Amino acid sequence: MKILFVLISILYAVYRFSSEEDVDSAYLANELEPVEDINSEQYAALEPKEEQERSCAGMGQDCKDDCDCCLNIATCNCWFGRYFCSCTFGDYQTCLRKKGKCKRNRPQSCPRSNLNRKKG
């Protein structure tokens, strides 16, 4: 009984292996048509779109002046005069300066730290 079971298993494995080779070789020889994806239109909407240019620069991004930086307290810090400029953290005075100077990305309010207030 065990021998019969092993023999049938071997014959089935040989049959499956040979039929897969026929399908693979027919597909490689272009005898079979590839299966079309009926949901391809559905996934077309999920493709990433090109990123549009932002009106302001985030922290660490390139800038030309303080008005290019997004955050209220962000300042445009330049190395060697006007070269290699990027947005970095500023302070309360930076925010006040941006409020008076900038037409776009103007801060609505300037955050003030609670560290220097006297209690008591």
Curated annotation (Swiss-Prot):
Residues 20-54 form a propeptide. Disulfide bonds join 56-70, 63-76, 69-87, 78-85. Keywords: Disulfide bond, Knottin, Secreted, Signal, Toxin. It is found in: Secreted. One of its GO terms (cellular component) is extracellular region. Belongs to the neurotoxin 05 (agouti) family. The presence of a 'disulfide through disulfide kOR' structurally defines this protein as a knottin. This is U13-lycotoxin-Ls1f. It comes from Lycosa singoriensis.
